[in-house]
């Protein structure tokens, strides 16, 4: 009986110690001190190498520190332990994407989509999938993924990305429609689009559609050193004069 009580006491002490370490790691992660959180998470994993909380948090810390190799190792361990967990496949897809492994990222995101019916997670998956497909220059696939994302949520970034895909395909009318929709969505949510490439591509699309005044306004947002902004702005001014 005494031995059992002693053993139970040790277990409780161990649990309390782990809880303290988890709290300490959480505080550092919240404060974005990821390099300080990792040694604490290491201590937890020495005691229990399969601690899913510690593995996930350490993977996240490595990812924020742009150590994608180590981040992938931890999330891959979780996938081995829980092969039907869609979130883990999604997170590994994120890590692979950030590390430039776009085709592998696409594969993991597709697995996550197959495993989950959760609307929020599916929306995240489709947006990540759209970005990965775009990086692979699979513009039609990127358009489809953006369209799927927009069934779940409305965000200007999805319209911008789909607009960029249309732009790459030289479908300037559809690109312009998405760029204008992005502005409307951002305005509705009291956000501002400040990305130079957005206004450059929007201006190019307007120029291609014969909307010279609108294009001129967009090109004036950019400085002369951004791509061929000065040339396009001068072309707009010339076209506006010709139309008078």
Language-model features, listed with the residues they occupy:
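Start-of-helix register in tetratricopeptide repeats
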Residues: 19, 53, 60, 87, ...
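Alpha-helical segment of the N-proximal tetratricopeptide repeat
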Residues: 19-47, 57-60, 64
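Register position in tetratricopeptide repeats
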Residues: 30-31, 64, 98-99, 128-131, ...
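Short coil turns that delineate tetratricopeptide repeat
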Residues: 49, 83, 117-120, 153-154, ...
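Canonical tetratricopeptide repeat
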Residues: 57, 91, 124-128, 161, ...
